């Protein structure tokens, strides 16, 4: 599946037109959008001729767009856990949503990896880092990591 690489496609956009306008005491707003199964050209500013995304296109014009990224896992929960923890999948232990023991045990081809359904409380996460820097955080939508 070609879009698997882009499961953790995200945009980090600063809300001001020109980051050089910040004084040393000002901090930029950060909008981190993490989208599951977003294709490389599914957004207007990335060249989509099918989908219309005018508001995201405007954000992209005013901010910073990252176009070179790495998906640390082949599905949503472990990728999200890696993004928020900074750890690779074997380090945080979130391999899938729910149990990895799916389907009929007799016909299963692989031994399921032991899976955690959440990040350990001891893991220092990106939202905690941002909070310590004075940011207010919010999460909307899917979570699946604790």
Task: Identify the residue ranges that each predicted region occupies.
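Sec-dependent N-terminal signal peptides
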Residues: 4-13
């Amino acid at each position: 599946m070609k879009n698997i690489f882009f499961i953790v496609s995200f945009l980090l956009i600063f809300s001001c037109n020109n980051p050089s306008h910040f004084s040393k005491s000002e901090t930029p707003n950060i909008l981190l959008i993490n989208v599951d199964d977003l294709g490389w050209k599914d957004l207007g500013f990335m060249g989509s001729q099918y989908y219309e995304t005018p508001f995201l296109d405007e954000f992209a014009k005013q901010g910073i767009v990252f176009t070179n990224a790495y998906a640390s896992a082949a599905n949503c929960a472990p990728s999200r856990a890696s993004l928020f923890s900074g750890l690779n999948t074997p380090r945080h232990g979130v391999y899938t949503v729910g149990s990895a023991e799916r389907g009929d045990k007799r016909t299963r081809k692989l031994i399921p990896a032991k899976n955690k359904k959440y990040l350990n409380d001891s893991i220092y996460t990106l939202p905690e880092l941002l909070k310590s820097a004075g940011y207010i955080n919010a999460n909307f939508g899917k979570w699946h990591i604790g």
